[in-house]
A protein has these predicted regions:
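Eukaryotic charged/polar low-complexity linker/IDR segments
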Residues: 154-156
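Conserved strand-loop elements at the edges of beta-sheets that form or border functional pockets
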Residues: 41, 128, 187
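Catalytic core of Fe(II)/2-oxoglutarate
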Residues: 2-3, 132, 143-151, 160-245
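Non-heme Fe(II) oxygenase catalytic core, chiefly the N-lobe of the double-stranded beta-helix
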Residues: 54-56, 84-89, 94-151
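Fe(II)/2-oxoglutarate
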Residues: 1-32, 238-245
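Histidine-centered active-site/metal-ligand motif
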Residues: 36, 138, 203-205
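Proline-centered turn/helix-capping motifs that create local helix->coil transitions or kinks
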Residues: 59-60, 113-116, 161-165
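Non-heme Fe(II)/2-oxoglutarate
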Residues: 9, 16, 25-109
Length: 245
């Protein structure tokens, strides 16, 4: 039986954020180095607390993603094992981010019509970086090859309740020429970052997490797509593009 919760993400998106989408859209569109927005206190406090309380442990058997030179001590790929080890209620909550209320909010905020959520959570869902961990600057893969859809929007929500600026792990947004970082965003609790995804929306958290950080850097990553003829062009699709690759 599904546990009754004292919050409702669907109606929070519908009643709190959807009415603000048109007002926020201009700031999103004009943000540099590429369209993005930072929204604090994004989830109802009870909802954010619940997700943090039940966030999968680093020892969860579904976590994977071995180290390489671009990402170190970063856990992800939990969806590849069908979320085994993740509490049932937490799995149910993921679907609220694929709901009509949230998708319409994303459409109106970004101006991108025909947004399609990802029930497979390919590359997304629960991520965490351990002390010493980092994620190199990169542009994400641009095509869902399984469904032939173009990737358009990333949504990142952070669950780090005691985070301080000295712990590293800031999300960095770089210019399209990969010359410099133009925005640094601290991954503080219940902060949401939404940005338009393209082949030059370079981002990452290259500064390693401090060894004395009292918690792992935890985030929920959600990716959204749209139909586009270019998704059928083998020459257009690419995997992750890493800085200095």
């Amino acid at each position: 039986m599904r546990k009754e919760l004292n919050f409702d993400l669907f109606y929070h998106f519908l009643d709190v954020w959807l009415p603000q989408a048109d007002r926020l859209a201009k700031g999103f569109e004009e943000a540099k180095p590429f369209p993005h927005i930072v929204l604090d206190d994004f989830l109802p406090r009870a909802g954010a607390d619940f997700i943090l309380e039940h966030f999968p442990s680093p020892t969860c058997r579904s976590f994977g993603q071995p180290d390489n030179k671009f990402q170190v001590r970063k856990l992800g790929q939990i969806q590849k094992n069908y979320f085994r080890g993740v509490p049932q209620t937490l799995r149910y909550l993921l679907h609220d981010f694929n709901s009509m209320a949230f998708v319409e909010f994303i459409e109106r905020l970004t101006g991108i019509r025909g947004i399609i959520p990802d029930p497979h959570f390919h590359g997304g869902a629960f991520h965490q970086s351990l002390p010493g961990g980092h994620l190199g600057i990169h542009a994400d893969f641009n095509v869902d090859r399984r469904r032939r859809l173009l990737r358009r929007v990333n949504v990142l929500i952070y669950f780090n309740k005691h985070w301080k600026s000295g712990y590293g792990g800031d999300l960095e947004l770089w210019d399209t020429s990969l010359i410099q970082c133009e925005q640094r965003i601290e991954p503080i609790f219940n902060r949401c970052v939404i940005f338009e995804t393209s082949s030059n929306s370079y981002h990452g958290h290259p500064v390693p997490i401090a060894e004395n950080a009292p918690e792992n850097r935890k985030s929920l990553a959600l990716y959204y797509y749209a139909a586009d003829q270019r998704a059928f062009d083998p020459g257009f699709a690419h995997s992750t593009i890493w800085k200095d690759e």
